[in-house]
């Protein structure tokens, strides 16, 4: 079916889109009403159980790590594997950070730093995700992926925050980690916001998550507190997302928020942290006879759930709205106080 591309202007309240029915009396209806706002988790077991129980509405799982360098564009900043700041060029290549001085048409390499987490081996590797420069702070993001003997894997997103008051010799202030693959990064209100999505390990006997997703600070790690989790109404894989707020001034994790389900797009501004996830909606009609055959109509459509959090240490959820179609691209225009979303409808 031919796709139509639609540009949609969303005000800060994120108005709801409408998903049309399937147009046949025998065809089951698909409604956005099945997508309700995430609810706060009451305890750890509720989170672990939610990760093990699925609703039958499919959600895209995070992409497998492929070792390639990522380039991500978000509101107001450019996050990539190369950053230019005050005549200095920072280049991130896998686990190596090179610092060059640009003068006219020539460049001089000044320094090379090993920024690996020390997890690389025959069964694991680390690859570059993003660089971000904000004032005298440099954020370096990598993902470490590993494969266990039973062919199960794990991914951990690492953030290293440097002081670049002396650009050629960055000083490491602190390292942070959070389970999952890197999804996006941005800065607002003196904070660095980092988003990752991953897959939880499941205990097959109990049907619940064997462990809670972890966050780390230097060498210490802990489970994401259940009080910081929101449970999605639509989940068809044991997936989760973590949003961390890190203070650029004192290099401390100021807050964390987590969701069941993955995040596909990230936009950050002073107006909020905007997250989008794709949802594949399916529905089956009742079986009926036609030409001596038993027929069951099957409807499939795509939807997107938009979430808006405060861009502060609390990361409070302000709004959740479902939209028909999949988000292809978006841009946050802070001056117009609006979010522009391009989505595709089948």
Task: Enumerate the predicted regions with their spans.
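Intrinsically disordered regions, especially transient/low-confidence alpha-helical propensity segments
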Residues: 1-2, 19, 159
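Bacterial N-terminal signal peptides that target proteins for export
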Residues: 1-9
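Hydrophobic core
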Residues: 14-18
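Beta-sheet-rich non-transmembrane sensory/scaffold domains
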Residues: 22-346
